[in-house]
From Swiss-Prot:
Motif extent ('HIGH' region): 121-131
Organism of origin: Buchnera aphidicola subsp. Acyrthosiphon pisum (strain APS)
Designated name of the protein: Arginine--tRNA ligase
GO cellular component: cytoplasm
Catalytic activity: tRNA(Arg) + L-arginine + ATP = L-arginyl-tRNA(Arg) + AMP + diphosphate
Length: 574
């Protein structure tokens, strides 16, 4: 049930009846719930367009919609607001529908093919904290769009091609390590050594470039080593994905190498279409849409003098593939803000070449950095980048210490399971609860707190409801009486439950999980107020008990579903 949309449509219908069209009513939650649960916020702006005083316009709108069953009362307040008090009986009817719905009353939308490009680590390197935001924010979007009925194509655009593989293969050859046991940790160590050698040893650099050419030309020996490197890396990455409880699997890997065979044809085609030209041995596209420091059209190199391809070339091919082969209607990229201009340039070239439709929805959902308390990039004490596995290990250990203090007699198996769910959930929620467009301060104490907008607080709210339901000893099938709402805290909780669909639809458009986190926190606090003000298990009447149990069940279902969309698990006991 999308309450905001319903109110908005009612207002638009009322405006049309008084010959006011093309207006966009802005509906917000009202902080003063006693006079209205929702509020029309831009009445003055609409009144100015219609040459009416706000009070006159408000009266006309109210006259047209006040008889609708949904509203208990509609009032005007100065200087220019309309307040909508929702009818508790109408709210109860909506809750009954949701109670019987496995999807909490949320319908499927018209399906689109949506590619979500996220995580995208590099081969031969361990995942680090820089990969966390892309991985978990992208995964929330994938889960939500899946739930709404879209055909979601998860694309893990791994860096599995390029000069670094020539370096690594050459190093493994020189050091006679090709047939030795290799781990991802060792591969990263060898890559660092290979890079240093490449920068100072001309013969080694030449050999590395030869291996790159061989690999690009399909040399079987180089290809077998490359495949081994990819396999070792992805095996470890998939372990991280499993620990993070994200939906990325090995089958979602769509690395840069997929597009390698397309690149020569794309260069030729862009030349033939006069989009690209050769200059000083390189192939360049000059884009008037982008200016260099001198105010001239910016040049985007798509092939180097040595005939090597660049990231821009790969991204153009990738776009063509996603549109023409995967039939994407919408493509969402989760990379940091530094990639923004690069992506815009690739999109512009792909459109000029008619590789993609002008109507294809292309979105770059940028995100900020994770910072330490001194507002610097979050690193180890030695200044190294923190590995994601180490971060999750510490989260689990810290959660374990907290749980041991609260439940010292817990079995080792239960302790490990609970520590993992709470620790990893806390890290994810701390990140997801911040606006992705901004940097945020990483704080262990804050994220593992059982107070405030944290995962443990919301997980605990869920377990508390489970405990209440268990104490009631009332099977769900016996809860046949209708929900009825009399107290303010009941009504406020009910309206918060109805708000869930609106939140999910908003995130599906904007890709901002912090809105869902904020909603779940407010839902949990609304339940807390309800619990404090209304006896659930021991009211005067049994029908009141059953009604409040149903309201509690709906809250628990919504909390669980919301956390699931964030990729965070619930527990029945904390």
């Amino acid at each position: 049930m999308n309450l905001k949309n319903t109110i908005k449509e009612d207002i638009q219908d009322a405006l049309i009846k008084i010959a006011i069209i093309n207006c966009d009513p802005v509906i917000t939650l009202n902080k003063k719930t006693k006079i209205g649960h929702y509020q029309l916020n831009n009445l003055i702006k609409i009144a100015n367009i219609s040459n009416l005083k706000p009070f006159e316009l408000a009266n006309r709108i109210i006259l047209n919609i006040k008889k609708k069953y949904m509203y208990k009362e509609i009032t005007f307040s100065q200087p220019g607001f309309i307040n909508f008090l929702i009818n508790p009986y109408w709210i109860s009817e909506q809750l009954e529908k949701i109670f019987l719905s496995p999807r909490l009353g949320i319908n499927h939308v018209n399906a689109q093919n949506i590619v979500i490009d996220y995580s995208s680590p590099n081969i031969a390197k361990e995942m680090h904290i820089g990969h966390l935001r892309s991985t978990i924010i992208g995964d929330v979007m994938a889960r939500i769009l899946d739930f709404l009925g879209h055909n979601v194509i998860r694309a893990n655009h791994i860096g599995d091609w390029g000069t670094q593989f020539g370096m690594l293969i050459a190093y493994l050859e020189v050091k006679k390590l090709v047939n030795s046991p290799l781990s991802l940790m060792k591969l990263e160590e060898y890559y660092c050594k290979a890079k240093k050698k490449y920068d100072i040893d001309q013969l080694f650099a030449e050999k590395s470039r030869e291996y790159v050419v061989k690999l690009q030309n399909g040399d079987q020996y180089c290809y077998s080593i490359w495949k081994k490197l990819v396999s070792i890396t992805m095996l470890e990455n998939c372990k991280i994905y499993k620990r993070l409880h994200v939906t990325l699997k090995k089958k979602h890997t769509m690395g840069e190498s997929i597009y390698n065979k397309m690149l020569p044809n794309i260069i030729e085609d862009l030349k033939n279409k006069k989009i690209a030209i050769e200059k000083n041995g390189s192939t360049i596209v000059f884009l008037k849409e982008f200016k260099n420091r001198l105010g001239e059209p910016m040049g985007v190199v798509i092939q180097k003098k040595d005939k090597g391809f660049l990231y821009s070339t790969t991204d153009i091919a990738c776009l063509k593939y996603r549109y023409q082969v995967l039939h994407a209607d919408r493509i969402i990229y989760y990379t940091d803000s530094r990639q923004h201009q690069h992506l815009l340039q690739a999109w512009t070239i792909a459109k000029k070449a008619l590789y993609i439709s002008q109507n294809l929805l292309l979105e770059h959902h940028i995100f900020g950095m994770m910072l330490s308390k001194d507002k610097r990039p979050f690193k180890t004490r030695d200044g190294d980048t923190i590995k994601l596995s180490a971060l999750l290990d510490e989260a689990t250990e810290r959660a374990m210490r907290l749980i041991k203090n609260k439940q010292p007699n817990l079995s080792k198996k239960k302790l490990n399971q609970l520590s993992n769910i709470i620790g990893v959930g806390a890290v994810k929620y701390a990140d997801l609860s911040k606006n992705r467009n901004t940097n945020y301060i990483f704080d262990w104490n804050e994220m593992l707190s059982f107070e405030g907008n944290t995962a443990p607080y919301i997980q605990y709210a869920y377990t508390r409801i489970v405990s209440i339901l268990k104490k009631s000893n009332m099977p769900i099938k016996k809860l046949k009486e209708k929900i009825f709402l009399t107290k303010e805290s009941e009504i406020n909780l009910a309206i918060k439950i109805l708000e869930f669909e609106e939140i999910i639809l908003l995130i599906s458009q904007k890709g901002t999980p912090h809105i869902l986190c904020k909603y779940l926190y407010h839902l949990a606090t609304s339940f807390s107020h309800f619990y404090e003000n209304c006896s659930i298990l021991f009211p005067k009447k049994i029908k009141t008990c059953k009604s409040r149990l149903k309201l509690s069940i709906l809250t628990a279902k919504t909390l669980k579903k919301g956390l699931n969309m964030l990729g965070i698990r619930v527990v029945k006991k904390m």
